[in-house]
């Protein structure tokens, strides 16, 4: 009985693949399950912040506008979401505002430039990141008194600076790597998938991510009682599939598939079934007729040792490796000696 050819490597060398990091950073407490100072006026989700931890000369005027809420998005296993809401303060509407950075209350006027959200490095008011996600996904529910009111989501991947998110801009200008800016009307629970816009021509060294939610797209507008629920935020890194086929140290009728999965295969806010890596073999490249020879339930890289059916021994054949949750496939020819 003849053996299959030795090692087929494609895309890049397997040893290099193993050396690459599978660490895809998420914003801590992305599911809003952990909270600090519960049932007090200083209640905030862990790693997220609102007016009660703000800075600036007018921060003492600000009141609580975020709270833990027991209404959660459809299908979640979590118990809590974050509720942000608007208030009327001395006749001025203060929009609900939640950020993983820090709020600054530098002006008495809602639209004042000194009222902003910012990254405060070397503190709890920042989130470090080492790459640029492809998109931000999150579940939201927005209710406003005026149907013309729009909520807003902003997220900035930026360089090594105390980056400031401003109305209609950001500072420092040359520190932006990627941006999400999205406005939306009142809605019941909805999962949003928001792609990051590339700004690496300004800065290509990501260090932090600053993400914020507000009940109105314009400061000082909207009505007291407008509210947004936020749940299960998840950064998406588009997945890729690579692999090698190896029959060293295998029996003559076996082949070992080493597959490398990178990126987000099964986002926890999408309620997908478990991802499966499936290996099939066929005599034709179109796989009109094929036999499954391996399967594993996993989201991460690994190996599958497959038994080759007798009908394929001594013939040229094709092997397909595919995933289910984020459909990807690779087809390679195995040439028999």
What are these regions (language model features)?
Residues 1-23, 243:
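Bacterial Sec-dependent N-terminal signal peptides
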Residues 20-137, 148-238:
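Aromatic (Trp/Tyr/Phe) and Gly/Pro-enriched flexible surface segments
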Residues 138-140, 255-267:
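Aromatic/hydrophobic beta-strand junction motif of beta-rich domains
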Residues 154-156, 276-280:
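Beta-strand signatures of extracellular beta-sandwich domains
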Residues 207-215, 314-325:
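Short, aromatic- and glycine-rich surface loops/edge beta-strands on solvent-exposed regions
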Residues 239-245:
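Proline-enriched interdomain boundary motifs that mark the N-terminal boundary
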Residues 246-253, 270:
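Short, solvent-exposed loop/linker segments at the N-terminal edge
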Residues 326-337:
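Edge beta-strands of extracellular beta-sandwich domains
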């Amino acid at each position: 009985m003849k053996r299959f050819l030795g090692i087929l490597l494609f895309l890049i060398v397997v040893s290099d693949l193993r050396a690459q990091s599978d660490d895809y950073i998420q914003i801590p407490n992305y599911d809003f399950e952990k909270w600090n100072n519960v049932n007090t006026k200083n209640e905030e989700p862990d790693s997220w912040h609102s007016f009660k931890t703000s800075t600036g000369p007018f921060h003492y005027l600000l009141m609580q506008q975020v709270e833990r809420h027991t209404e959660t998005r459809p299908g979640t296993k979590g118990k809590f979401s974050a509720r942000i809401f608007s208030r009327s303060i001395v006749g001025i509407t203060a929009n609900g505002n939640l950020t993983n950075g820090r709020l600054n209350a530098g002006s008495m006027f809602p639209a004042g430039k000194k009222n902003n959200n910012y990254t405060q490095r070397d503190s709890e008011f920042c989130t470090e990141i080492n790459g640029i996600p492809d998109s931000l996904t999150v579940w939201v529910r927005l209710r406003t008194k005026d149907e013309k009111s729009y909520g807003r989501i902003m997220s900035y991947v930026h360089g090594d600076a105390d980056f400031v998110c401003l109305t209609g801009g950001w500072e420092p200008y040359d520190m932006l790597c990627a941006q999400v800016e999205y406005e939306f009307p009142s809605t019941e629970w909805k999962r949003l998938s928001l792609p990051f816009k590339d700004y690496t021509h300004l800065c290509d060294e990501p260090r932090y991510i600053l993400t914020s939610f507000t009940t109105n797209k314009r400061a000082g507008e909207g009505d007291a009682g407008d509210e947004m629920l936020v749940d299960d935020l998840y950064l998406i890194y588009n997945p890729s599939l690579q692999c090698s086929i190896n029959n060293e140290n295998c029996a003559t009728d076996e082949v070992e598939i080493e597959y490398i999965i990178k990126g987000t295969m099964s986002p926890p806010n999408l309620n997908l079934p478990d991802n499966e890596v499936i290996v099939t073999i066929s005599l034709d490249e179109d796989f009109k007729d094929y036999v499954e020879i391996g399967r594993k339930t996993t989201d991460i890289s690994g190996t599958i040792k497959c038994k080759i059916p007798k009908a394929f021994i001594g013939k040229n054949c094709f092997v397909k490796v595919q995933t289910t949750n984020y459909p990807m496939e690779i087809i390679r020819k195995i040439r028999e000696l």
